[in-house]
Amino acid sequence: MVTMYFFTLSFGTVASGIMVISALNPVHSVFWLVVAFISSAALFILLGVDFIALMFIIIYVGAIAILFLFVIMMLNLTDFTPAFRRGGEADMTNYVPIGLAVGTLFFEAIASSWLIMGGPYVYRGLLGAWDLANPWFLKKYHNIEAIGRILYTDCYYLFILVSFILLVAMLGAIVLTQEIGTEIGPTAKKQDIFVQTSRAQV
């Protein structure tokens, strides 16, 4: 029964992810993104990691997806040409190498995960991985404490890398708001709510 639930939720997550990038309406894309987040949270609950599942629902569904929805509602999408509708001219072949590179990276990660988790024991010993069939770190500690121990001991470099990525994203947002030629002005350091919410050109 658990296996059936796992495959059902996995299929739902993958299908929702496909619908996110294939839906023509941006609001529908956000809806399918919320479905993908909820399916992923259900998978974590099924695995017994309830803390990450709750964080998925609170942060991704309650904050990020709603933020995407507000951004889509504030954008004037009628200014963009409907590239994927009938008669639209869109050449997406330039993105094929990027898609292949990202797909290869994901498949390599999946293969590495199989060697660590489900592969022969000799590979697990060579890679220095845990025997996840007997998750001692989830049995000895609460899952929040186990995640903290793993995050700040063995995966500390990933934590530092994420902090640098967030710093770059923050600096990029500041640079984008100082874009020259915008309606607010090239050197504006304040918000003009009327200009931001107005659909007409000022």
UniProtKB/Swiss-Prot annotation:
Chief subcellular location: mitochondrion
GO cellular component assignments: mitochondrial membrane
Bilayer-crossing regions: 1-21, 29-49, 52-72, 96-116, 156-176
Catalytic activity: a ubiquinone + NADH + 5 H(+)(in) = a ubiquinol + NAD(+) + 4 H(+)(out)
Family: Belongs to the complex I subunit 6 family.
PANTHER family the record matches: NADH-UBIQUINONE OXIDOREDUCTASE CHAIN 6
Name listed for the protein in its UniProt record: NADH-ubiquinone oxidoreductase chain 6
